[in-house]
Curated annotation (Swiss-Prot):
Belongs to the Fmt family. Keywords: Protein biosynthesis, Transferase. One of its GO terms (cellular component) is cytosol. Attaches a formyl group to the free amino group of methionyl-tRNA(fMet). The formyl group appears to play a dual role in the initiator identity of N-formylmethionyl-tRNA by promoting its recognition by IF2 and preventing the misappropriation of this tRNA by the elongation apparatus. This is Methionyl-tRNA formyltransferase. The keyword Ubl conjugation does not apply. It catalyses: L-methionyl-tRNA(fMet) + (6R)-10-formyltetrahydrofolate = N-formyl-L-methionyl-tRNA(fMet) + (6S)-5,6,7,8-tetrahydrofolate + H(+). InterPro entries: Fmt, Formyl_trans_C, Formyl_trans_C_sf, Formyl_transf_N, Formyl_transf_N_sf, Formyl_transferase-like_C_sf, GART_AS, Met-tRNA-FMT_C. Its EC number is 2.1.2.9.
Protein backbone atom coordinates (compact mmCIF):
# COMPACT_ATOMS: atom_id res chain seq x y z
CA UNK A 1 0.00 0.00 0.00
CA UNK A 2 1.06 3.62 -0.48
CA UNK A 3 1.96 5.92 2.36
CA UNK A 4 -0.39 5.77 5.32
CA UNK A 5 -2.67 8.78 5.67
CA UNK A 6 -3.82 10.50 8.85
CA UNK A 7 -7.61 10.55 8.48
CA UNK A 8 -10.42 12.38 10.26
CA UNK A 9 -13.69 10.51 9.73
CA UNK A 10 -17.03 12.37 9.88
CA UNK A 11 -20.26 10.39 9.69
CA UNK A 12 -23.31 9.33 11.68
CA UNK A 13 -25.58 6.42 10.55
CA UNK A 14 -24.90 2.76 9.86
CA UNK A 15 -24.03 3.56 6.22
CA UNK A 16 -21.17 5.71 7.52
CA UNK A 17 -20.11 3.17 10.15
CA UNK A 18 -19.57 0.56 7.43
CA UNK A 19 -17.07 2.90 5.77
CA UNK A 20 -15.32 3.64 9.05
CA UNK A 21 -15.05 -0.09 9.74
CA UNK A 22 -13.14 -0.62 6.49
CA UNK A 23 -10.83 2.33 7.23
CA UNK A 24 -10.01 0.90 10.65
CA UNK A 25 -8.74 -2.31 9.08
CA UNK A 26 -6.77 -0.51 6.36
CA UNK A 27 -3.21 0.71 6.75
CA UNK A 28 -4.37 4.28 7.31
CA UNK A 29 -4.59 5.96 10.72
CA UNK A 30 -7.96 7.31 11.86
CA UNK A 31 -6.91 10.11 14.23
CA UNK A 32 -10.37 11.33 15.20
CA UNK A 33 -14.07 10.88 14.51
CA UNK A 34 -16.76 13.55 14.22
CA UNK A 35 -20.39 12.47 14.54
CA UNK A 36 -23.77 13.97 15.43
CA UNK A 37 -24.63 14.46 19.12
CA UNK A 38 -26.43 11.57 20.84
CA UNK A 39 -30.15 11.65 20.09
CA UNK A 40 -33.24 10.33 21.92
CA UNK A 41 -34.33 7.03 20.38
CA UNK A 42 -36.51 4.02 21.09
CA UNK A 43 -39.61 3.75 23.23
CA UNK A 44 -38.01 5.33 26.25
CA UNK A 45 -36.50 8.21 24.25
CA UNK A 46 -33.16 7.32 25.78
CA UNK A 47 -30.13 9.28 24.54
CA UNK A 48 -28.49 6.98 22.01
CA UNK A 49 -25.05 7.29 20.38
CA UNK A 50 -24.72 7.06 16.61
CA UNK A 51 -23.43 3.81 15.04
CA UNK A 52 -20.25 5.71 14.12
CA UNK A 53 -19.65 6.78 17.72
CA UNK A 54 -20.19 3.23 19.00
CA UNK A 55 -17.65 1.84 16.53
CA UNK A 56 -15.09 4.58 17.19
CA UNK A 57 -15.27 4.06 20.96
CA UNK A 58 -14.80 0.31 20.51
CA UNK A 59 -11.48 1.18 18.84
CA UNK A 60 -10.55 3.90 21.37
CA UNK A 61 -10.58 6.67 18.77
CA UNK A 62 -11.27 10.23 20.02
CA UNK A 63 -14.88 11.22 19.28
CA UNK A 64 -16.11 14.80 18.78
CA UNK A 65 -19.82 15.69 18.67
CA UNK A 66 -20.24 19.41 18.00
CA UNK A 67 -23.69 20.70 17.07
CA UNK A 68 -22.04 22.89 14.43
CA UNK A 69 -18.63 23.36 12.86
CA UNK A 70 -19.10 27.10 12.39
CA UNK A 71 -17.75 28.25 15.80
CA UNK A 72 -13.99 28.86 15.75
CA UNK A 73 -13.43 26.67 18.82
CA UNK A 74 -15.04 23.70 17.05
CA UNK A 75 -12.97 24.30 13.92
CA UNK A 76 -9.90 24.29 16.15
CA UNK A 77 -10.72 20.65 17.10
CA UNK A 78 -10.36 19.70 13.43
CA UNK A 79 -7.14 21.67 12.98
CA UNK A 80 -5.52 20.19 16.10
CA UNK A 81 -5.80 16.65 14.66
CA UNK A 82 -3.36 17.61 11.87
CA UNK A 83 -4.97 15.27 9.34
CA UNK A 84 -3.96 14.58 5.76
CA UNK A 85 -7.58 14.16 4.69
CA UNK A 86 -11.09 14.26 6.13
CA UNK A 87 -13.49 11.55 4.95
CA UNK A 88 -17.17 12.54 5.18
CA UNK A 89 -20.00 9.99 4.87
CA UNK A 90 -23.58 10.98 5.77
CA UNK A 91 -22.35 13.27 8.55
CA UNK A 92 -25.32 15.63 8.64
CA UNK A 93 -23.44 18.87 9.36
CA UNK A 94 -22.27 21.51 6.89
CA UNK A 95 -18.49 21.88 6.63
CA UNK A 96 -17.57 25.58 6.32
CA UNK A 97 -14.72 26.66 4.02
CA UNK A 98 -12.10 26.93 6.80
CA UNK A 99 -12.71 23.26 7.72
CA UNK A 100 -12.64 22.15 4.07
CA UNK A 101 -9.19 23.73 3.74
CA UNK A 102 -7.63 22.37 6.93
CA UNK A 103 -6.53 18.83 5.91
CA UNK A 104 -3.52 18.75 3.57
CA UNK A 105 -5.51 16.89 0.90
CA UNK A 106 -8.84 18.53 1.70
CA UNK A 107 -12.11 16.76 2.48
CA UNK A 108 -13.68 13.96 0.43
CA UNK A 109 -17.28 12.76 0.53
CA UNK A 110 -18.89 9.41 -0.27
CA UNK A 111 -22.31 10.08 -1.85
CA UNK A 112 -24.95 7.48 -2.73
CA UNK A 113 -25.65 8.45 -6.34
CA UNK A 114 -23.99 8.89 -9.72
CA UNK A 115 -23.39 12.62 -9.48
CA UNK A 116 -24.46 15.10 -10.70
CA UNK A 117 -27.70 13.11 -10.45
CA UNK A 118 -29.45 13.23 -7.08
CA UNK A 119 -27.43 15.70 -5.09
CA UNK A 120 -28.85 16.06 -1.60
CA UNK A 121 -30.25 14.14 1.34
CA UNK A 122 -32.17 11.17 -0.14
CA UNK A 123 -30.38 10.01 -3.31
CA UNK A 124 -31.18 6.30 -2.98
CA UNK A 125 -34.91 6.84 -2.49
CA UNK A 126 -35.24 9.47 -5.21
CA UNK A 127 -33.44 7.34 -7.80
CA UNK A 128 -35.82 4.46 -7.06
CA UNK A 129 -38.94 6.59 -7.15
CA UNK A 130 -37.89 8.22 -10.43
CA UNK A 131 -37.55 4.82 -12.08
CA UNK A 132 -33.80 5.13 -12.78
CA UNK A 133 -32.20 1.98 -14.21
CA UNK A 134 -28.99 2.43 -12.24
CA UNK A 135 -27.47 4.31 -9.34
CA UNK A 136 -24.12 4.07 -7.60
CA UNK A 137 -21.54 5.77 -5.43
CA UNK A 138 -19.53 8.90 -6.19
CA UNK A 139 -16.51 9.98 -4.18
CA UNK A 140 -15.86 13.69 -4.58
CA UNK A 141 -13.57 16.43 -3.39
CA UNK A 142 -15.79 18.59 -1.22
CA UNK A 143 -16.46 22.27 -1.81
CA UNK A 144 -18.93 24.65 -0.16
CA UNK A 145 -21.81 23.64 -2.46
CA UNK A 146 -24.31 20.83 -1.87
CA UNK A 147 -22.65 17.75 -3.40
CA UNK A 148 -21.14 19.90 -6.17
CA UNK A 149 -17.44 19.03 -5.79
CA UNK A 150 -15.17 17.50 -8.43
CA UNK A 151 -15.55 13.72 -8.77
CA UNK A 152 -12.64 11.42 -7.90
CA UNK A 153 -14.28 8.00 -8.31
CA UNK A 154 -17.61 6.56 -9.51
CA UNK A 155 -19.02 3.04 -9.22
CA UNK A 156 -22.33 2.13 -10.91
CA UNK A 157 -24.92 -0.32 -9.59
CA UNK A 158 -28.01 -1.52 -11.51
CA UNK A 159 -31.41 -0.96 -9.91
CA UNK A 160 -33.32 -4.23 -10.13
CA UNK A 161 -37.14 -4.42 -10.43
CA UNK A 162 -37.44 -5.83 -6.90
CA UNK A 163 -35.00 -3.40 -5.23
CA UNK A 164 -36.16 -1.34 -2.25
CA UNK A 165 -34.29 1.50 -0.58
CA UNK A 166 -33.20 -1.06 2.02
CA UNK A 167 -31.65 -3.44 -0.53
CA UNK A 168 -30.03 -0.61 -2.52
CA UNK A 169 -28.66 0.86 0.70
CA UNK A 170 -26.93 -2.45 1.44
CA UNK A 171 -25.50 -2.67 -2.08
CA UNK A 172 -24.10 0.86 -1.97
CA UNK A 173 -22.79 0.34 1.57
CA UNK A 174 -20.71 -2.52 0.13
CA UNK A 175 -19.53 -0.60 -2.96
CA UNK A 176 -18.68 2.65 -1.17
CA UNK A 177 -15.89 1.42 1.13
CA UNK A 178 -14.12 -0.30 -1.75
CA UNK A 179 -14.17 2.89 -3.80
CA UNK A 180 -13.08 4.92 -0.79
CA UNK A 181 -9.95 2.82 -0.28
CA UNK A 182 -9.06 3.10 -3.97
CA UNK A 183 -9.51 6.87 -3.84
CA UNK A 184 -7.33 7.20 -0.74
CA UNK A 185 -4.61 5.18 -2.48
CA UNK A 186 -4.67 7.62 -5.39
CA UNK A 187 -4.65 10.64 -3.10
CA UNK A 188 -1.70 9.21 -1.18
CA UNK A 189 0.43 8.69 -4.30
CA UNK A 190 -0.81 11.87 -6.06
CA UNK A 191 -2.41 9.95 -8.95
CA UNK A 192 -6.01 11.04 -8.26
CA UNK A 193 -7.76 12.79 -11.15
CA UNK A 194 -10.70 15.07 -10.36
CA UNK A 195 -13.50 15.51 -12.91
CA UNK A 196 -15.78 18.54 -12.65
CA UNK A 197 -19.52 17.88 -12.45
CA UNK A 198 -21.74 19.07 -15.29
CA UNK A 199 -24.31 21.21 -13.50
CA UNK A 200 -26.64 21.05 -16.52
CA UNK A 201 -27.43 17.43 -15.61
CA UNK A 202 -27.88 18.00 -11.87
CA UNK A 203 -31.00 16.74 -10.10
CA UNK A 204 -31.85 17.17 -6.41
CA UNK A 205 -32.84 14.52 -3.90
CA UNK A 206 -34.87 16.34 -1.28
CA UNK A 207 -35.27 14.83 2.16
CA UNK A 208 -38.21 12.44 2.48
CA UNK A 209 -41.31 13.46 4.38
CA UNK A 210 -44.01 11.32 5.96
CA UNK A 211 -46.61 13.32 4.02
CA UNK A 212 -45.12 12.13 0.72
CA UNK A 213 -45.55 8.52 1.78
CA UNK A 214 -49.34 8.67 1.49
CA UNK A 215 -50.29 6.84 -1.71
CA UNK A 216 -51.78 9.11 -4.35
CA UNK A 217 -54.12 7.04 -6.47
CA UNK A 218 -54.00 9.68 -9.22
CA UNK A 219 -50.54 8.34 -10.08
CA UNK A 220 -50.01 5.33 -12.34
CA UNK A 221 -49.71 1.85 -10.85
CA UNK A 222 -46.04 1.81 -11.90
CA UNK A 223 -45.36 5.06 -10.03
CA UNK A 224 -47.18 3.81 -6.93
CA UNK A 225 -45.24 0.53 -6.92
CA UNK A 226 -41.94 2.45 -7.19
CA UNK A 227 -43.05 4.74 -4.37
CA UNK A 228 -43.67 1.70 -2.15
CA UNK A 229 -40.17 0.35 -2.84
CA UNK A 230 -38.55 3.78 -2.44
CA UNK A 231 -40.19 4.38 0.96
CA UNK A 232 -39.19 0.96 2.35
CA UNK A 233 -37.90 0.90 5.12
CA UNK A 234 -38.83 4.54 5.97
CA UNK A 235 -41.26 6.25 6.18
CA UNK A 236 -43.28 3.43 4.46
CA UNK A 237 -46.09 4.16 2.01
CA UNK A 238 -49.63 4.05 3.36
CA UNK A 239 -53.30 4.66 2.61
CA UNK A 240 -56.25 5.50 4.86
CA UNK A 241 -59.21 3.17 5.34
CA UNK A 242 -61.89 3.52 8.04
CA UNK A 243 -59.92 6.58 9.24
CA UNK A 244 -56.90 4.39 9.99
CA UNK A 245 -53.50 4.37 8.25
CA UNK A 246 -52.43 1.06 6.72
CA UNK A 247 -48.80 0.76 5.61
CA UNK A 248 -47.97 -0.98 2.35
CA UNK A 249 -44.74 -2.98 2.21
CA UNK A 250 -45.11 -4.86 -1.05
CA UNK A 251 -47.20 -4.56 -4.20
CA UNK A 252 -47.12 -5.39 -7.89
CA UNK A 253 -48.39 -3.76 -11.06
CA UNK A 254 -51.17 -5.35 -13.08
CA UNK A 255 -51.01 -3.77 -16.53
CA UNK A 256 -54.72 -3.89 -17.22
CA UNK A 257 -57.19 -1.16 -18.08
CA UNK A 258 -60.25 -0.47 -15.93
CA UNK A 259 -63.12 1.99 -15.99
CA UNK A 260 -63.08 2.82 -12.27
CA UNK A 261 -62.19 5.94 -10.32
CA UNK A 262 -58.59 5.88 -9.00
CA UNK A 263 -58.52 4.46 -5.47
CA UNK A 264 -61.44 2.09 -6.07
CA UNK A 265 -61.04 -1.47 -4.75
CA UNK A 266 -61.57 -3.81 -7.70
CA UNK A 267 -60.94 -7.19 -6.10
CA UNK A 268 -59.69 -8.59 -2.77
CA UNK A 269 -58.58 -12.20 -2.35
CA UNK A 270 -55.58 -14.31 -1.36
CA UNK A 271 -53.65 -12.98 -4.38
CA UNK A 272 -53.87 -9.43 -3.05
CA UNK A 273 -55.98 -6.29 -2.86
CA UNK A 274 -56.39 -4.81 -6.33
CA UNK A 275 -56.82 -1.03 -6.43
CA UNK A 276 -57.50 1.13 -9.47
CA UNK A 277 -54.75 3.64 -10.23
CA UNK A 278 -54.79 6.43 -12.82
CA UNK A 279 -53.20 3.97 -15.21
CA UNK A 280 -53.24 0.25 -14.47
CA UNK A 281 -53.98 -1.63 -11.26
CA UNK A 282 -51.93 -1.87 -8.06
CA UNK A 283 -52.11 -5.31 -6.42
CA UNK A 284 -51.20 -4.89 -2.74
CA UNK A 285 -49.60 -8.01 -1.25
CA UNK A 286 -48.13 -7.09 2.17
CA UNK A 287 -49.66 -4.59 4.58
CA UNK A 288 -49.38 -3.38 8.16
CA UNK A 289 -52.35 -1.89 10.04
CA UNK A 290 -51.56 0.57 12.83
CA UNK A 291 -50.10 -1.22 15.85
CA UNK A 292 -49.92 -4.60 14.09
CA UNK A 293 -47.19 -6.65 12.45
CA UNK A 294 -46.61 -6.86 8.70
CA UNK A 295 -48.99 -9.41 7.18
CA UNK A 296 -50.14 -10.82 3.85
CA UNK A 297 -53.24 -9.45 2.15
CA UNK A 298 -55.00 -12.74 2.92
CA UNK A 299 -54.26 -12.46 6.66
CA UNK A 300 -55.60 -8.90 6.77
CA UNK A 301 -58.70 -9.90 4.81
CA UNK A 302 -59.35 -12.64 7.37
CA UNK A 303 -59.73 -10.03 10.12
CA UNK A 304 -60.77 -6.89 8.23
CA UNK A 305 -62.57 -7.96 5.06
CA UNK A 306 -65.10 -5.15 5.55
CA UNK A 307 -62.32 -2.65 4.80
CA UNK A 308 -61.78 -4.02 1.31
CA UNK A 309 -65.21 -4.53 -0.25
CA UNK A 310 -64.95 -4.17 -4.06
CA UNK A 311 -66.40 -0.81 -5.09
CA UNK A 312 -65.24 0.95 -1.92
CA UNK A 313 -62.60 3.67 -2.20
CA UNK A 314 -59.27 3.97 -0.38
CA UNK A 315 -58.03 7.42 0.59
Amino acid sequence: MSDSLRIIFAGTPDFAARHLDVLLSSGHEVVGVFTQPDRPAGRGNKLTPSPVKVLAEQHSIPVFQPKSLRPAENQAMVEALDADVMVVVAYGLILPQPVLSMPRLGCINVHGSLLPLWRGAAPIQRALWAGDSETGVTIMQMDVGLDTGAMLHKIACPILPQDTSATLYDKLAALGPRGLLETLERLADSSAVAEAQNDAFATYAEKLSKEEARLNWLLSAEQLERCIRAFNPWPVSYFIVDEQPVKVWKAEVIAKSHGSQPGTILQADKQGIQVAAADGILNIQELQPAGKKVMSAQDLLNSRREWFVPGNTLN
